[in-house]
Amino acid sequence: MRSATYRPPGLVLTEHEFEVPVDHARPDGDKLTIFAREVVPTGRENEDLPWLVFLQGGPGFEAARPTKPGDPVWLEPALKDHRVLMLDQRGTGRSTPLDVDGMPPDAQADYLKHFRADSIVRDAEFIRVELGVRQWSVLGQSFGGFCVTTYLSLAPHGLAAAYITGGLPPVDRHIDDVYRATYKRALARNHAYYARYPDDRDRVRTLLERLESEDIRLPSGDRLTAR
């Protein structure tokens, strides 16, 4: 573990880097670096505060980069009685990036399966043990909520509490049922939108035709498509 501490106004930020296995079932195999930022209010860095781990949504988004106690907005109330750990999940932010360039398809699929919620949870457990924390709480937003429920399944012994603000897996339902309901809801919302703004129908159609006929790129270099 490597650490460095910074002190923006109102906060003490300690940045940690942990070396974890790509495949936790093969601890002697290839390694990844996981980045996590510990956040505590100024003047309370030496207190024995309970830990709260934030699991970001996405998947594919890094954790927020706080510059003050109220950024993001949930951070300030959380810091009243917690030491917050903001985790860049594997493949995101300052953790080892996800790179499958040059791999054959089978190797890509085998590598990508190690970037799911189960591996993210095992990373968190590795970090908990490394930091010497007996138990901590987790807060999951969107995809982070799926990570929280996976955490409850795989390592409940490591948790004092679990909070979900979005991303709750269905119970006794197949994911296809959820998507069928989602598509119907999206279609209904589209009808409602165009009923209110009928002139936008031609505008959107023009945009779709342009996306089909032109190679328009996002800042990441990926092509922007209509699908």
Task: Please name every model-derived segment.
Residues R2-G221:
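Gly/Pro-rich cap/lid or specificity-loop segments adjacent to the active site
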